[in-house]
């Protein structure tokens, strides 16, 4: 796929990926629906180790179960036992990122709030605790209504 007038955005995403090898990076990508946000990220992360997590309108427990499978398949993060809430799953991600670098893309991030209204503050708390020792490149993407 060719991207027109997106060179700067691709370079920023690629630079963030490089920087995250040394310290955690958190990127927020927003835009109208169907403008190519996911395609842009996919192109920018070509060759990187990354996982794509889509926030569907499922229960928190069902999404956590789906995300556990995707994390194991895409970046080799094995979660022992069954995690049923986002906070615990995000903690596993942050702990793993202290040992090695990888990227997590969470698409339709705004939908997490509908499933668990406390999730944004819980993610902020864990990010604040771990980001100084983490090598996670976290990209959250969402649509502007």
For the regions a language model picked out, list residue spans one by one.
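Phosphate-binding site recognition
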Residues: 1-145
